[in-house]
């Protein structure tokens, strides 16, 4: 094998289709575009979503919902997540370091999902009534 003998595998390369270059090429005259109509003409393509003047689907359907501007700054943490943490005291910094909440989060709330079997002190976080009861039942407390 020499460098001058190297070539691509058979069938791996295809010649570019040259259209509109005479009748003998097999792709002359209309160049594969058919006869007449918008798509046969130069520049004859409509924009995405255009339905020929009919009211397009994206405008027929009503607008719904909104984007919350506070979503990035508030987070929820489950009892299951807290159970997995090694820390005896849990605050926002501990949650950020563990990757349970994002870096932008300013406040977090503990929700009752999963079980808590060990004593944990929650500092500076909100908690639902169910989560509060579960934390206190496990011997933990919620500090302000």
Swiss-Prot record:
GO terms for cellular component: cytosolic large ribosomal subunit. It holds the Pfam family Ribosomal_L27A. Transmembrane segments: none annotated. Residues 1-48 are annotated as: Disordered. Residues 21-31 have a biased composition (Gly residues). The keyword RNA-binding applies. HAMAP family: Ribosomal_uL15. Part of the 50S ribosomal subunit. Belongs to the universal ribosomal protein uL15 family. This is Large ribosomal subunit protein uL15.
């Amino acid at each position: 094998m020499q460098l001058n003998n190297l070539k691509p595998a058979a069938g791996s390369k295809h010649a570019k289709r040259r259209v509109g270059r005479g009748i003998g090429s097999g792709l002359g005259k209309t160049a594969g575009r058919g006869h007449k109509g918008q798509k046969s003409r130069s520049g004859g393509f409509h924009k995405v979503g255009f339905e020929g003047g009919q009211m397009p689907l994206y405008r027929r359907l009503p607008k719904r919902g909104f984007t919350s501007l506070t979503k990035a700054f508030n987070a929820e943490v489950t009892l299951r997540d807290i159970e997995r943490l090694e820390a005896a005291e849990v605050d926002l910094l501990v949650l950020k370091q563990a990757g349970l909440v994002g870096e932008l989060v300013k406040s977090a709330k503990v929700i009752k999902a999963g079980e808590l079997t060990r004593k944990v002190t929650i500092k500076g976080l909100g908690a639902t009534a169910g989560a509060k009861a579960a934390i206190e039942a496990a011997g933990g407390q919620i500090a302000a």
